[in-house]
């Protein structure tokens, strides 16, 4: 048999020609208009969003938020950096897609028939309803029939405009509204509570989070049923970005990452309590300033605001608090626990906070390493409340009922079962008030959300006041001091004592740049 002589040069040339011929059909690479190829060639995923407590926010200069976290993971999935552009309202977001300034919109946007005519939706990941809001103490409308443009204002590009138009044509011909081209939904809700506006419309999740900081905002009525939330990208013949998004969300769903992120941002519950929230925020103003140094001093592995939320749940920041079961002090420690921690006076606020932190750290150290880092605190808090042994039972019960014992979202749903005989009778450590542990952790999360948002709001107000002061009394050179056109500064320069100096860092704050590199 004649041996074949292989012409490697010919094979190489043939393979090169074949690759060139097939290159345009390769889904993620190739032609210039392939979106994934363009993103990877650029080395960054451009995402436009809006600034809300849920979608995108910052604490101490560090970005966070449901949509931000998902977008960051998607950028990592593609092997590129994330570039976030923050816009003022929804209309500006879609302008970014239209003008080619964004690859994706990740901003809690609702899927609807009008939007999908012009833009490509991605997978849906939670749902909301649109609700009419008003200020507590003002007139609550029970229907839209008589609302006028002087009363009702909505944000530009808001999905509810289509619903309002349909309602006007089919049910309420007298209905009218105004669109404010300069404000987003959060700013309009602020206008409502400040008495500048009677009503606006926002989605149910945004309202729930807003109420944690502004409990005087109330829901008048639902405008729509539940609507799915999704991301949007340009609509054209290129489906590579859509395919990558689908693969990404499927992978996140299968490995439980999506459920964990949603639990982190949406798992605080929607059972808003006006009186409780208002009472808490009043305590933030009246009591927290005296306790803040202690929380900051002893908070080590956790944020001091979370520690403050724990202490409020325990005692409402009352160092003398005592329960019928004998627990006492700011962190409501038992006598035995206090003795084991070397605490001599449970009613001493500093001793109690220090001891409570050490006890919580002990619980944290016992949580299995398999539990994700950002969920360990919730397991530890449940153990802090009902005992670590019962937390082990809750994890075991979760595994037996086909849940994930390392997922707080799964375990917390089983906590109430620990007080039901058909379940606790089969567990190692028996009966526990699991429903109380569930409520305990959920309340702490709500207080933390309220505290973080409220302090941010206070900081924003202080910054705005300082900026206004800077505008009213602009900086001048020392040689100008004393001249009549600056009488206020002249007064300051002539004061021999107790004079006021304004550091530029106090007068001016860095404005949030629209584009943030992450």
From Swiss-Prot:
Residues 1-21 form the signal peptide. GO terms for biological process: cell wall macromolecule catabolic process; cell wall organization; peptidoglycan catabolic process. It is found in: Cell outer membrane. Gene3D superfamilies: 1.10.530.10, Periplasmic binding protein-like II. Its main location: membrane. It comes from the Bacteria. The keyword Cell membrane does not apply. Murein-degrading enzyme that degrades murein glycan strands and insoluble, high-molecular weight murein sacculi, with the concomitant formation of a 1,6-anhydromuramoyl product. Lytic transglycosylases (LTs) play an integral role in the metabolism of the peptidoglycan (PG) sacculus. Their lytic action creates space within the PG sacculus to allow for its expansion as well as for the insertion of various structures such as secretion systems and flagella. This is Membrane-bound lytic murein transglycosylase F. It comes from Shigella boydii serotype 18 (strain CDC 3083-94 / BS512). The lineage of its organism: Bacteria, Pseudomonadati, Pseudomonadota, Gammaproteobacteria, Enterobacterales. The gene is mltF.
């Amino acid at each position: 048999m004649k041996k074949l002589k292989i012409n490697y040069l010919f094979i190489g040339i043939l393979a090169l020609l074949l690759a060139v011929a097939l290159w345009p059909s390769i889904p993620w690479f190739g032609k210039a208009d392939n979106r994934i190829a363009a993103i990877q060639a650029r080395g960054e995923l451009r995402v436009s969003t809006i600034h809300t407590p849920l979608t995108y926010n910052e604490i101490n200069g560090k970005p966070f938020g449901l949509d931000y976290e998902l977008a960051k993971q998607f950028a990592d999935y593609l092997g590129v950096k994330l570039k976030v552009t923050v816009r003022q309202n929804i209309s500006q977001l879609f302008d970014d897609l239209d003008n080619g300034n964004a690859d994706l919109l990740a901003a809690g946007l609702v899927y609807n028939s009008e939007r999908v005519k012009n833009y490509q939706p991605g997978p849906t990941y939670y749902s909301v309803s649109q609700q009419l809001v008003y200020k507590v103490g003002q007139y609550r409308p029970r229907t839209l029939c008589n609302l006028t443009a002087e009363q009702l204002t909505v944000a530009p590009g808001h999905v509810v405009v289509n619903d309002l138009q349909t309602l006007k044509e089919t049910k309420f011909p007298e209905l009218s509204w105004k669109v404010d081209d300069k404000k987003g939904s959060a700013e309009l809700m602020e206008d409502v509570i400040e008495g500048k506006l009677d009503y606006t419309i926002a989605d149910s999740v945004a309202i729930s989070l807003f109420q944690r900081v502004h409990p005087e905002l109330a829901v008048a009525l639902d405008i729509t049923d539940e609507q799915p939330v999704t991301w949007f990208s340009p609509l054209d013949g290129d489906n590579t970005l859509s395919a990558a998004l689908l693969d990404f969300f499927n992978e996140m769903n299968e490995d439980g990452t999506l459920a964990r992120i949603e639990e982190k941002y949406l798992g605080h519950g929607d059972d808003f309590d006006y009186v409780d929230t208002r009472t808490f925020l009043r305590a933030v103003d009246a009591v927290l300033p005296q306790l803040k140094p202690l929380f900051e001093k002893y908070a080590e592995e956790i944020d001091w605001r979370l520690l403050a939320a724990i202490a409020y749940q325990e005692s409402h920041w009352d160092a003398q608090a005592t329960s019928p079961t004998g627990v006492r002090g700011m962190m409501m420690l038992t006598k035995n626990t206090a003795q084991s921690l070397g605490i001599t006076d449970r009613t001493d606020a500093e001793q109690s906070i220090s001891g409570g932190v050490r006890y919580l750290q002990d619980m944290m150290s016992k949580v299995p390493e398999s539990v994700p880092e950002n969920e360990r605190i919730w397991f530890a808090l449940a153990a802090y409340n009902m005992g670590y042994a019962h937390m082990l039972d809750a994890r075991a019960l979760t595994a037996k009922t086909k849940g994930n014992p390392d997922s707080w979202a799964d375990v917390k749903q089983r906590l109430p079962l620990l007080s039901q005989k058909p379940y606790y009778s089969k567990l190692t450590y028996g009966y526990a008030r699991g429903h109380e542990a569930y409520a305990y952790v959920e309340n702490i999360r709500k207080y933390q959300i309220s505290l973080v948002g409220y302090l941010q709001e206070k900081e924003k107000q202080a910054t705005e006041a300082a900026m206004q002061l800077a505008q009213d009394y602009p900086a001048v050179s020392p040689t100008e001091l004393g001249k009549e056109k600056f009488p206020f500064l002249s007064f300051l320069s002539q004061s021999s004592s107790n004079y006021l100096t304004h550091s530029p860092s106090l007068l001016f704050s860095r404005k949030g740049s629209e584009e943030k590199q992450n």
